[in-house]
């Protein structure tokens, strides 16, 4: 009887975890689905082979990050704390 109760509890735990929608990636605010709903658009593919559907209204709330503008003619006069050395691997020999 105790084993039966444990199995029933575990069965409900598995079902509740599987019912949640999976998020696409950390930096994307979408969900993985087979088909996108109305008002959503397909951005990229998920690892499971489904579509990453992003809502238009949620996307408008998030402002895209822009890189600061650097002048191409100016050179930086700051010394670097490190030196980039060439690496040699088995494939380059």
From Swiss-Prot:
Keywords: Antibiotic, Antimicrobial, Defensin, Disulfide bond, Secreted, Signal. Belongs to the beta-defensin family. It comes from the Eukaryota. Has antibacterial activity. Disulfide bonds join 24-52, 32-46, 36-53. Residues 1-18 form the signal peptide. One of its GO terms (cellular component) is extracellular region. GO terms for biological process: defense response to Gram-negative bacterium; innate immune response. The keyword Disulfide bond applies. This is Beta-defensin 128. Its main location: secreted. It is found in: Secreted.
